[in-house]
Amino acid sequence: SGGVRSTRDEEGDDMVPTHMFLTRGVGVHKEKLAAFEQALRSAGVAYCNLVSVSSILPPHCKILPRKRGEKFLNPGEITFCVMARSETNERNRLISASIGLAIPTDRDTYGYLSEHHAYGETDEESGEYTEDLAAQMLATTQGIEFDPDVAWKEREQVFKMGGKIVRTLNITQSAVGRPNRWTCVIALAVFIPTENIPKSLLNKA
């Protein structure tokens, strides 16, 4: 985006991500760590050295489709992400992992990402929870008054009618545990290193 505000470190490398993508995965294996590896492969990020960061969506950061975003990652590079992870080795136990986003109307300001992992929650339940959580965090920085005790769908309308939150969304993965196997689910928001983004994409309005 031509309006991106850059923050650079001493070497001049851009440390504020301009692009990201959402992904999810599930893995099943008799070994816990191998199940996690399978989930990373399912999510398309097993070849990166992932570093978990906290919950800020940078100003002007664009969300790319997963298939497009994956093309800008290189094997072995340090890749920042917000990750939710859940695992079980219990038969028939429902697990879920979810990432929620809340995007402000004013893209000069930052948004929020939230992560959540749970037992016994469906995709829809976990997804609504993370969207709600991200929206609440953003609402508190925007001075939006809301009732934390009403249902998310009602609160969602209040947030969006206020004009300061333009969009909320989530990506969620759930699975049911299998006997004698570890099952792992993950959901991620992956920040693409800015030096990997073509200039033509960076300059696009």
Regions found by a protein language model. Name each.
Residues R5-A205:
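Helix-coil modules at protein/domain termini and other flexible surface or pore-lining loops
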